[in-house]
Amino acid sequence: MAPAVLTAIPNRMSLRSLKWSLLLLSLLSFLVIWYLSLPHYNVIERVNWMYFYEYEPIYRQDFQFTLREHSNCSQQNPFLVILVTSRPSDVKARQAIRVTWGEKKTWWGHEVLTFFLLGQEAEREDKVLALSLEDEHALYGDIIRQDFLDTYNNLTLKTIMAFRWVIEFCPNAKYVMKTDTDVFINTGNLVKYLLNLNHSEKFFTGYPLIENYSYRGFFHKNHISYQEYPFKVFPPYCSGLGYIMSGDLVPKIYEMMGHVKPIKFEDVYVGICLNLLKVDIHIPEDTNLFFLFRIHLDVCQLRRVIAAHGFSSKEIITFWQVMLRNTTCHY
């Protein structure tokens, strides 16, 4: 009996090896076929930003506002307006911001307003969810929504909506910031930073990304096609985690948006518009003001930052409470 058992074991191992070999061969064949089926484009090394420009404003978006803020911002002169991109389902994230960095409306006598940017639910809306969003807006009055689909690829439409809203309904804002729900904002630090600026016109800053390469790989979220963006390098731009601009730039950028076809990445899109307008990005001297990647921050670091990306709603609440403690920092 022993020889039979010994013979069976190698046979099973051989069968298993054969299965793995066939699987790997199939995968390799699929990748080869997929690669050969792709249209091949020559990546353009030298960037010509006029490639994106149309003389007539044929890209002006005409989506309708279906929800708007309760406060009459057009009759106010806010020092800073913070516009936060959000999904309809991000109820907890919006509430976390309302009770932390977006709660206080006045900093050292300067008015700061926070609003949320949404599109329509991409899938068929559950009636309970739709009603809860309407109720949420009725309660807080801080939701701005247009009738385009709320999807990742439509983030640029949200940004265009933000610029249009400022022009039409809040034109007196001295500064405007666009950010996301997973970003921790040290609002007090942000206001101090803006108050200490030497100039307040044609100002644009954030986490600068210079000589950032366009990605053509498998990861869909970061991929951009050659048809949409044929150049190897993106323009200088600020990460969408949080960029800040002076109020005078908002109508200039929005006007340019009507001449530039939207692309997948809203922050890159704004960067293209800035380059066409010949507006330089202000690079902060302190490199610890904006954090693009998720990092561990202690209470003293939190007090120094302006914006840090990659946090849950629960973490934002916890970090805000920690930051407000009477802890002495020696650096």
UniProtKB/Swiss-Prot annotation:
One of its GO terms (biological process) is oligosaccharide biosynthetic process. Keywords: Glycoprotein, Glycosyltransferase, Golgi apparatus, Lipid metabolism, Magnesium, Membrane, Signal-anchor, Transferase, Transmembrane, Transmembrane helix. Residues 44-331 are lumenal. Belongs to the glycosyltransferase 31 family. Pfam families: Galactosyl_T. Pathway: Protein modification; protein glycosylation. The keyword Cell wall biogenesis/degradation does not apply. It is found in: Golgi apparatus membrane. GO terms for cellular component: Golgi membrane. GO terms for molecular function: galactosylgalactosylglucosylceramide beta-D-acetylgalactosaminyltransferase activity; N-acetyl-beta-D-glucosaminide beta-(1,3)-galactosyltransferase activity. Its EC number is 2.4.1.79. Its main location: Golgi. The gene is B3galnt1. Glycans are attached at residues 72, 154, 198, 212, 326. It comes from the Eukaryota. Its cofactor is Mg(2+). It catalyses: a globoside Gb3Cer (d18:1(4E)) + UDP-N-acetyl-alpha-D-galactosamine = a globoside Gb4Cer (d18:1(4E)) + UDP + H(+). The keyword Protein biosynthesis does not apply. It is a single-pass type II membrane protein. Transfers N-acetylgalactosamine onto globotriaosylceramide. Plays a critical role in preimplantation stage embryonic development. It comes from Rattus norvegicus (Rat). This is UDP-GalNAc:beta-1,3-N-acetylgalactosaminyltransferase 1.
